[in-house]
Amino acid sequence: MKTTLTCGLTLIGLSAGISSADIMSISGGIDTSIEQTGVSFDAMLDYNYTGGTNGTLTIEIANTTAEAAIGGYLTGFVFNILSSDAAASAVLISGTNTSFLNTGIENAAPFGTFDAGAALGANWTGGGNPNSGLGVGNSGTFEFSVSALDADLLSSSSFVGAGEHFAVRFRGLDDGGSDKLLAPAPGTGAVALIGLGIFSRRRR
């Protein structure tokens, strides 16, 4: 299935409001999924230090599943905070999809426990009807308030690591199944290039 142009333009438009150069792009697909269903996602992370022990993390994430027969909804994502502060936290303060709620510390089986995230019903495993998630070709923007003693030293990569620190959940696939993905090692780049590239490379 051809990824909708609306989705690509939406993410590019959202990216226009990001002023920081510290932007990281990540993605996940069949190579990093548990069930290898073919679902996929692309995301951009932007961290900004705001003063004291505080910062703001903005995550733009899209369901880029390419095959219409797969279907499904992106229903949650979680991440770790690679901080020297063991009490570091990130709390969801806004999102374009209001069905996504703050998870806090979440057991995202089978990957383990993560520091923060957002999911339908604040639940990685369930969370109610998956139709409230991000369908194929749709994206959402979520903003987290970050608190850490070393907030001034954090960057966008502090929430991804080599990829194993960011996980995404899909439910409601057309065959009734679900899947869970980790992000592979991320890359960085200019906002405009990321916005164009992450969608065009999956068009069929």
Where are these regions (language model features)?
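Prokaryotic Sec-type signal peptides and long signal-anchor helices
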Residues: 16, 146-148, 203
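Positively charged n-region of N-terminal signal peptides that target proteins for export
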Residues: 1-4, 200-204
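Sec/Tat signal peptide C-region and signal peptidase I cleavage site
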Residues: 17-21
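Sec-dependent signal peptide recognition
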Residues: 2-8, 187-191
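A short, hydrophobic C-terminal helix/tail in secreted or cell-surface proteins
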Residues: 184-201
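Mature extracellular "passenger" or substrate-interacting domains of secreted, surface-exposed proteins
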Residues: 22-182
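Bacterial N-terminal signal peptides
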Residues: 7-15
